[in-house]
Curated annotation (Swiss-Prot):
It is found in: Golgi apparatus membrane. InterPro entries: Ric1, RIC1_C, WD40/YVTN_repeat-like_dom_sf, WD40_repeat_dom_sf. GO terms for biological process: intracellular protein transport; positive regulation of TORC2 signaling; retrograde transport, endosome to Golgi. The chain crosses the membrane at residues 661-681. The modification Phosphotyrosine is found at Y293. Belongs to the RIC1 family. Keywords: Golgi apparatus, Membrane, Phosphoprotein, Transmembrane, Transmembrane helix. Probable component of a guanine nucleotide exchange factor (GEF) that may be required for efficient fusion of endosome-derived vesicles with the Golgi. The gene is ric1. Gene3D superfamilies: YVTN repeat-like/Quinoprotein amine dehydrogenase. This is Guanine nucleotide exchange factor subunit ric1. GO terms for cellular component: cytosol; Golgi membrane; Ric1-Rgp1 guanyl-nucleotide exchange factor complex. Component of a guanine nucleotide exchange factor (GEF) complex. It is a single-pass membrane protein.
């Protein structure tokens, strides 16, 4: 869903960089070298501060080793080789005089997020702490600095008593000796890495023996024995589960390969990633509020790529960057490959650490290779220019406000005459920071992905793919690359970057974007952006969830002056005009929304209520929003923020119920974390409505619901992209009606009027809570009646499963590349991958997205035939019968059935396809069979002839339709399969027919074929003599001569 696209750049440093990391929540990053701390602003890319140690400080503290940054309290903590932790306080002040890029310019051009230009960064040195046990690693948890000892498995937590920059900073410390707890398995190992994720409120530790531990509540515990932790990643356990074990291989070597080298988390999908020494990335699913971890997926890039150095997840959780010693790869949340350095020869470099930009449109990675002062990479022959920086010294440290940044285009072999500046220290190294630009699919910023339209976004524009507009052309080309570029309004993106949400209408006619504040609507037909007229009003509004289009209206959940509101916009002018705007207030933040029908929607809020809202246009032509009803979901969801989408599905039998009762009869499709679950109503004797939970699919990255009725066979079909591939359910609503709900009993058993407080009752709500994470900032505080102990929830996860009928109806689809969207009206899957290029003139290296389009109809029809649903398969094929490539689709169906590995399944498929073709005679199916024969190896021909007729039967159909070209193709197949003599007379008849109708292409083809059979051209001469005598000629001698020559061909 992220694709390398554009021209990568690089920043070169004149000293060896140890670590780079982004300052959370702001567009700044820090570079740590052995003697310096460099602070860069990303937009515009500028070095705004540099802290350099004095000689005295360097001798006392030693070289820098590790760095950790916290933006909430403005803390920078640096660990040194002499066991000191230096603590700094920084503030970013945009109100200070703007720093200019050069003496000749007054300000930067306002690109995305650059309206303030370079911002003043003020830094204060606050204190230094020395830890006698040595410093192995450190991390910042809120206002506490956590670090691990270098001599024993001991964790030290130093909490700042105050973070006021105007006061003297002091710390209070406590220590945890992990040798006192049983869950820390190897007491002789050390803690080599600390990782804290505030979103899931969990600390992760990596030990020197390659294990990974999870810990809940380090700072809240007062002694070591009260710590709760568990081992998540154990190389010994992974080694036992290997299926390809070699008994002669050294066990210690295998354990060393499985040792963890790096870890990261994905809070949006509740996943923990662990990289190992052999280059494998493991994904662990977090269950039972962080108390259980299950290894579900793994990915290994290449044996030559080396160990995993770094793993970084985007803010939306939809992309994972993995850096190796020699290469990099981007993966989907469940470790499906999206893009890799091996796909292009120009950007094949290793990454030691890095981070995603705030809008995830770029990745900043520190190269794994260091360079000497001669410009030569350590261990390689790669040369690169060096950029010198003048260093200054003060007694303690100094902060430089401005420094030039050199950004150059990447070049694998830099043969230009670069000036290598002299550096006093001959042992000094340089490092390179690579900036990789990415295109981001709009799927990641939408509440529910749309069909028919594919979009990709960068920092300053949106790309809309128009490939589908060419699918009905006469050219049989599925891979046309054509994009419409929609540039964001410059003033808006300059001040409100990053663009957090993008919503595209199903037909691509309307687009909405939302940044930090306000929003904007683009009308494609007019090529016009509509924004707020009042800039102050725009600053008061912030969109809280993905926006949705319904008809010509845009629906957005916003926070406006601390009020939680639903806004309804009409794209006909400025967004703050009364005629184009309607509002409805709520008691809490809107988490997600979905459309029910043409004029209604459901809204889910953070206080755990699901609301049914209706909108319309009144008699005066103004928009109106009306509240219908609500349901309390507090007993069902414990963490509302984990709910990514809620879709209301109404069974066909209940289509005419009153709108006010809609929530109490419908089925709810809920995407929570990576689980797609169904909530259906279950009748009880107490006449209360109970929700029954069933899991439809796990490891869900995104899904589509087809609401278009242009293709009736796919109406209400659901397409789900999971960690194991694309899955499809046809006629989804009908399956729901037949499996989950006994509609008649439900209606008869319900009272006409129910008290609202009794509409939802507790049944198996624990099953939905199993996948939620433990986090005080995300857990909804329920009443006393809803409290429960979550320690036993993991036992119930096996009971959460969908019925067998749903599993049987599931169709698995293959998608080559990374799926962008489903073009249901054209029967195509739209995928993408990256290609690298190099301009030979200026040697610029760049990458661009390449579109691939593949028909999905063969796999669906194949699956329907295996499910004994031939009538449904026939209807589906006839629905797409107008497409110019329908014959190609049916031919692919036949060839895939022929190449099925399972022999019994293959026979069933070929038999079903033959019956299918008999009911599709209007498609001239004999041509499809001939096309498949021409492209299939001869060893498979007997199976085709068994079910679709011998060559003479196919020839008969060709002659009945007077299709000379197909007859010529069939003749060649006949000759190869049964010999030349068996088709000699038929050969002459077809040759004569082609001459009669003056089809010279067929004549030339047949003549060439005779020459290939008899290079001496006796066959061709005899055939021409026979045909030259006319159709009434009965020269037996020439006929016998032609037959004898054909028999001679068969002998050889």
């Amino acid at each position: 869903m992220y694709f390398l696209h554009g021209t990568p750049q690089r920043i070169q440093l004149s000293s060896r960089a140890i670590q780079i990391c982004r300052i959370p929540k702001v567009s700044f990053f820090v570079v740590l070298t052995e003697t310096e701390i460099l602070i860069y602003q990303i937009r515009p890319l500028t070095l705004i501060s540099k802290i350099t140690k004095s000689q005295n400080l360097f001798e006392r503290h030693g070289k820098n080793k590790k760095i950790a940054v916290n933006s909430e309290y403005g803390i920078i903590a640096v660990a040194t080789e002499k066991n000191y932790v230096a603590v700094y306080h920084f503030t970013l002040n945009a109100s200070k005089p703007v720093l200019t890029p050069s003496p000749y310019l007054t300000r930067y051009d306002d690109g995305p997020g650059e309206i303030f230009g370079p911002i003043k960064c003020e830094i204060q040195y606050k204190l230094a702490m020395r830890y006698g046990g040595g410093l192995k690693c450190l991390e910042i948890q809120r206002d506490s600095i956590v670090y691990a000892a270098d001599s024993a498995p001991i964790i030290q937590v130093s909490t700042l008593e105050t973070t006021d920059p105007n006061k003297l900073w002091k710390v209070s410390s406590k220590q945890y000796d992990l040798r006192e707890v049983t869950w820390f398995l190897d007491h002789s190992s050390l803690i080599s890495r600390l990782y804290f994720d505030v979103k899931i409120d969990t600390f992760f530790w990596m030990s020197t023996d390659g294990r990974v531990y999870a810990n809940i509540g380090v700072s809240s515990n007062t002694n070591t024995k009260s710590l709760f932790g568990l081992c998540v990643h154990n190389p010994v356990d992974l080694n036992k589960s290997d299926n390809d074990k070699d008994i002669n291989e050294d066990l210690e070597s295998k354990l060393r390969e499985k040792k963890a080298t790096v870890l990261s988390t994905n809070a949006r999908f509740s996943l923990l990633y662990v990289g190992t020494a052999d280059g494998t990335v493991y994904a662990y699913e977090i269950r039972d509020f962080g108390r259980q971890y299950v290894q579900t997926h793994s990915f290994k890039y290449s044996a030559s790529s080396g160990k995993v150095n770094h793993i970084a997840t985007t803010g939306d959780g939809h992309q994972v960057m993995v850096g190796y010693d020699d290469g990099w790869a981007t993966l989907s949340p469940y470790l499906n490959l999206c893009c890799a350095s091996s796909e292009t020869e120009y950007f094949n470099f290793g990454l030691s650490c890095g981070f995603w930009d705030r809008d995830s449109s770029s990745f900043y990675g520190l190269g794994s290779k260091n360079f000497s002062s001669t410009g030569e990479a350590e261990g390689t022959g790669l040369s690169t220019p060096i950029i010198a920086e003048s260093l200054k010294e003060n007694d303690e440290f100094f902060a430089m406000e401005k420094e030039n940044v050199d950004i150059q285009y990447l070049s694998q072999n830099d043969n230009t005459n670069d000036v290598l500046y002299s550096i006093t220290d001959s042992k000094q190294f340089i490092s390179t920071i690579y900036i990789l630009p990415f295109l981001k699919s709009t799927i990641v910023s939408s509440v529910q992905s749309t069909l028919q339209v594919c979009g990709a976004q960068t920092s300053d524009r949106l790309y809309i793919s128009k490939s589908y507009e060419f699918c009905s052309s006469v050219k049989n080309n599925f891979g046309i690359d054509f994009w419409d570029q929609v540039e964001y309004p410059q003033p808006y993106v300059a001040s409100e970057w990053p663009i957090r949400y993008v919503s595209i209408k199903d037909d691509g006619s309307l687009i909405a974007i939302a940044g930090l504040h306000g929003l904007a609507i683009y009308v494609c037909s007019k090529k016009t952006w509509f924004l707020y007229k009042d800039a102050n009003m725009e600053q008061l509004i912030s969109v809280t969830c993905p926006m949705i289009w319904c008809s010509q209206f845009l629906l957005a959940g916003v926070v406006c002056e601390s009020n939680f509101e639903l806004h309804l916009y009409k794209a006909k002018g400025p967004l703050d005009d009364r005629e184009n705007l309607a509002k409805l207030s709520f008691t809490s933040t809107i988490v997600t929304m979905s459309v029910c029908d043409e004029y209604s929607l459901v809204v889910y809020t953070a206080d755990n209520f699901l609301h049914h809202i209706r909108f319309d246009i009144n008699e005066l032509g103004r928009l109106e929003l009306d509240y219908l009803t609500s349901v309390n979901f507090a007993p069902i969801f414990t963490t509302p923020s984990r709910v990514r989408s809620i879709t209301l599905l109404l069974p066909k039998d209940l289509a005419n119920i009153q709108p006010s009762d809609l929530l109490f009869y419908a089925v709810l499709l809920v995407l929570i974390n990576g689980k797609l679950v169904l909530l259906s109503l279950k009748k009880q004797h107490s006449k209360e409505l109970l929700y029954q939970c069933s899991m439809l699919a796990g490891d869900v990255e995104f899904y589509f619901i087809n609401g278009s009725q242009e293709i009736p066979s796919l109406f209400h079909s659901i397409w789900i992209m999971t960690g194991k591939g694309l899955k499809l359910w046809l006629s989804f609503s009908e399956i729901l009606s037949s499996v989950l709900i006994n509609t008649k009993n439900l209606i008869d058993g319900l009272p006409k009027f129910l008290n609202t407080s009794k509409r939802v009752s507790l049944e198996n709500f624990h099953r939905l809570s199993v996948e939620d994470l433990r986090s005080p900032s995300f857990v909804y505080k329920n009443g006393v009646d809803c409290n429960f102990d979550n320690t036993h929830l993991a036992k119930l996860i096996k009971n959460v499963n969908i019925s067998e009928k749903f599993q049987k109806e599931c169709i698995d689809l293959e998608s080559q590349g990374c799926l962008l969207t489903v073009l249901s009206n054209y029967g195509l899957l739209l995928t993408a991958y990256t290609q690298g290029h190099k301009n030979l003139v200026n040697k610029m290296e760049y990458a661009h997205i390449q579109i691939g389009v593949y028909p999905f109809l063969p796999e669906i029809v194949r699956a329907l035939l295996l499910l004994d649903k031939r009538e449904q398969a026939i209807d589906l094929v006839k629905t797409y019968g107008h497409l110019h490539y329908i014959n190609f689709v049916l031919e692919k169906l036949l060839s895939s059935s022929l190449l099925t590995y399972n022999s019994s399944q293959r026979d069933k498929l070929l038999y079903e396809v033959s019956l299918l073709f008999k009911d599709l005679q209007e498609f001239t199916t004999f041509k499809i069979v001939l096309g498949c024969l021409r492209k299939t190896e001869a060893e498979y021909w007997p199976m085709i002839f068994k079910y679709f007729g011998e060559p003479k039967d196919l020839m008969k159909k060709c002659l009945e339709t007077e299709d000379v070209k197909s007859a010529a193709e069939c003749l060649i197949i006949w000759q190869i399969h049964q010999g030349s003599a068996s088709c000699a007379s038929t050969f002459l008849s077809i040759y004569e027919m082609a001459l009669k109708i003056k089809n010279w292409d067929v004549c030339t083809e047949l003549s060439s074929y005779l020459v290939s059979l008899d290079p001496e051209k006796r066959l061709l001469k005899t055939a021409l003599e026979l045909l030259d005598e006319g159709p009434d000629s009965k020269d037996i001698r020439l006929y016998d001569q032609f037959n004898n020559l054909m028999k001679e061909v068969d002998k050889y």
